[in-house]
Amino acid sequence: MDPAMCSELLSFLKPETRADVRAQALEYILGVSGTPEGRQSLCAEPRLLQVVLDLTTEQSAHIAQDAHHVLVNLTSDPTTHKSLLGHVPTLLPSLLTLLQDPTCPFSDSTCTALCNLSREEESCQSFLQTLKQEGLCQLLHMLCTPKYNGHASLDYLGPLVCNLTQLPEGRDFILDRDRCVIQRLLPYVTAGSTVRKGGIVGTLRNCCFNHRDHEWLLSDQVDLLPFLLLPLAGGEEYTDEEMESLPPDLQYLPEDKERESDPDIRKMLIETVQLLCATAGGRRIVRQKGTYLIMRELHSWERESYVSRACEKLIQVLIGDEPEAGLENLMEVTVPPDLEETFTRVDQEDEGSLDQ
């Protein structure tokens, strides 16, 4: 941005300037933040960024709202994150304070900006360092408290927590056996908006990469599997013998039982179950719980090819032979790079042919 233009905007945004002039200047910045070039130019101006952040608490609702929208636009571009966090060290603490305020009318925008900032691993690491244990506990409390903020849905808390679990520290918090964190999330697999549910299911999927926790996750202490299978189950009839093999929560479902309507969430649920099959103990429990029956009926019902493909992969594991000795833990098997490339290419070709 031209230095003269930046100085002029800063003069228009001073607290003593008339509110209508400040509003017009901020509207201009909001427009600039809507393009990739504009975002890069704004992120090169630390003083301007700080002023925009300060305006998120402006008494004028219109100005505060536009300031939030500018930050949402800026954070939507991953290439800006390093500049934003470097030029404005108070950005993360300030946004977290706004998010945790149950009276803030713009918390949905704040949550979206933080969700954007936590997508990339490097900025996510900065976020976790800012949050610390107390902040993580507060985020979970907000996520599990209906109407925590009467002015905002806070649906993007789901994807935000999911982003944090891309890192081992985030997963370790959710999987803390003393805090019973993951158990508090399970009811929300089938409750709330698609955005919130998708974030919760994504969190569970990320946590299942910690293969040493699989048997605990499948034990009665957590009982994760029924929560994953219920959204995938319909109202199909089973034989008495088949019904007995299913977890109690999946037995005798009503004929009008509907499956999860979002195909991306269905795919994530299937992938989460497949991750639990990566260990010998996990495969044994998943098979014993009648998972194949749910997948069989889902595959017959499913109309989205990419979800059907995920279903087929899981079924292959469920009905396949056990790996040879020494290869029981699929997450610890080293795949040569050339074979990995071949498998990836075959998967892409299969998905392409299914979409045609």
From Swiss-Prot:
InterPro entries: ARM-like, ARM-type_fold, Hgh1, Protein_HGH1_C, Protein_HGH1_N. It holds the Pfam family DUF383. PANTHER family: PROTEIN HGH1 HOMOLOG (PTHR13387:SF9). Belongs to the HGH1 family. This is Protein HGH1 homolog. It comes from Xenopus laevis.
